[in-house]
Amino acid sequence: MPCAAPYPDADREAVYRAIRERRDMRHFAGGQVEPAVLERLLRAAHHGPSVGFMQPWRFIRVSDPALRRRLHACVEAERLRTADVMGDGTAQQADGPAVQGAGRQAEFLRLKLEGILDAAELIAVALADGREGHVFGRRTMPHMDVASAGCAIENLWLAARAEGLGMGWVSIFDPADVARLLGLPPGAEPLALLCLGPVRDFYPEPMLERERWARRAPLASVVFEGAWGRSAPWLSAEEAEQENPAARRPEGATESDRKRGPAHREPEPGGARSDG
């Protein structure tokens, strides 16, 4: 029985390239996103898969500068609360020694975590109210509404990369505060603040990987055969590339581009930037 044909080679590679080069962007170049492009991106998001075809996502475009500032203040408040939690204990730095809590806290505060005030567009994503009525695929796993919305966000992310636009997912906020600011009805829940717009450059590797906050796990550590922890012998030599993710760089990037990269940390005198 004949099977469906794959995409032509160039089309197939374009899909995989968008996946490889997608980045969680924090640095934006201002400008604007044309309405037709924004609609195209949101249509791609709306074509995301959802459990039971529940389509739980709702998108709110935030165009009021004052509302943006209030949302930014929510993120900043939670950023500081998160830093306080990091002040205790130790954490393992990628490719480095364990970092004491105070050191990890300082590292966190120096990171730029969002571009709410800089991005051309700010899109809030919320889970719709009335989700309890959707039980298809959710009776034993009600959190599949979150998983479904995540699929829509990834669609938007990949489409944005294909359009040459950066996107960053911000989740450092108190949901109750954001729900109040956005006027969400009872039962609806904010899930993400998406910063979207033109960027000068895409990071040659994930920002947190470059900052040695964490690194991508080897594929063999997350793929099993038949049972948890049982290695998959069919994995190819790609595993060597997974072990050394810094060796990968976007098409057209030079080795000096990889080493230099964008300036990921932008502290103000006396401390971190107020926008993370």
Description of each model-found segment:
Residues 45-46, 123, 131-181:
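Small-aliphatic-rich amphipathic alpha-helix that forms the alpha element of a beta-alpha
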Residues 38-43:
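Short amphipathic alpha-helical segments
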Residues 80-91, 184-206:
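A glycine-rich helix N-cap at a beta->alpha junction
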Residues 47-52:
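Glycine-rich phosphate/pyrophosphate-binding beta-alpha loops
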Residues 1-18, 105-109:
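Extreme N-terminal tail/first-helix region
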Residues 14-31:
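Generic N-terminal amphipathic, Lys/Arg-enriched alpha-helix
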Residues 55-149:
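Glycine/small-residue-rich phosphate/adenosyl-binding loop
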Residues 2-7, 11, 193-276:
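C-terminal helix-cap and adjacent tail motif
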